[in-house]
Amino acid sequence: MDYLNNLENNFKEICNECCYKETEKCNYRKCNIGFADYVVRNIKDNSTYSIADGENLIPQDDFKYYEEKAIAKGIANICRLCKECNEGHNENCVIALTRRALEYTQLKDKMEYPGNVILYLMNVSKQKPELAELIKEEYMRIG
């Protein structure tokens, strides 16, 4: 399955629901979904796999409401991408940055990815059990 295309479609759906779409307030540097979409396009277009100090580029002041189920769908696809990756896990890889950008829309604390989806879901459930359950359901559905 093409999880990268799934992510792009997921981001389009989220953006289509946003009241800022195609306005002067629509700026990927200030929007977590816009940032994540930008990173995914760079994976595809430029074969970029890591961004030095990339975590500092993720918008920290995006307080828009995002549908929890749509975010869970994106995170599930990212977890599948991470599982398929053979580059070795690090927090500046584009997959981790995309995941973190989505997490910031739903979770108040930074979430570490331990390299295993089960442990990750356990960590997410400590902050937001309903999000962990949605991620798990989508992860199983697309797998």
State what each model feature region is.
Residues M1-G143:
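Cysteine-centered metal-binding/redox modules
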